[in-house]
């Protein structure tokens, strides 16, 4: 009887350990990675620019063909000037989610908040075209004298239920949430130069904050070509709030577009299918209310 009881207890203990271990593996994202099957996932490119210097070497047709070649089903596009975004959207409206970037003419990342009439420019473009976000714009250094402008921009975004796409460090993000806790934000490049610890802290502090990981692929992939441990923690904990992106801010990025998408698929391949799918396209599907699938490839 004693041995039978011990065997029963031992069996229950083994079963519980297996269940707990399985749950931890799922929470940790350590169960079977998607591997090469990642190539069969559609990608939503959450950080595309179609700036004027690209228009001649890369026609709108060329851009959509590049997307097709890399199974990029859809892209979030902002441009300098906005006409670039609209050219792409008019050519392939089913493939492009347009954002409204403030930059045009002599208005750029370093002076856009100080240019008279910038608010009117944004309002007029919104009235003319179906933009689904404001950005990507830069806040290089926080200047609280811009508060009134940003309050109006936030109001503009909230009226249309769209996101701000913000290129900045953590403090401007905190400041924007301080102006209005209900503002919707996509953090461009997940902070770019910020440490993984700073990224984790900000994502933890603001549960509604999304981020694109453009230009972060080599931070995410460690020197051994596996996911960096600190980034893995971010990816698993905030898998519902991350999206990949290319950042075609210069023509060299267009030149290397296939390699950029491939590098993003490489780190996604290290993740469980459920996590990889979210970051590749399902989170964007949720944000922008679009059906994203490989059926879009070859269409406009």
Residue ranges, per PLM feature:
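Mid-to-C-terminal alpha-helical segments outside catalytic/metal-binding sites
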Residues: 2-10, 26-44, 59-74, 78, ...
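Active-site gating/metal-coordination segments in enzymes
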Residues: 28-37, 83-163, 210-218
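Acidic/histidine-rich helix-loop elements
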Residues: 48-59, 107-114, 219-223
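Bacterial N-terminal signal peptides
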Residues: 11-23
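Active-site environment of divalent metal-dependent phosphoester hydrolases
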Residues: 51-53, 82-85, 105-107, 141-143, ...
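Active-site metal-binding loops of divalent metal-dependent hydrolases
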Residues: 48, 137, 190, 215, ...
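Catalytic pocket-lining loop regions of alpha/beta-barrel enzymes
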Residues: 100, 144-244, 272, 291, ...
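Acidic/histidine-rich, surface-exposed loop or edge segments in extracytoplasmic proteins
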Residues: 42-50, 158
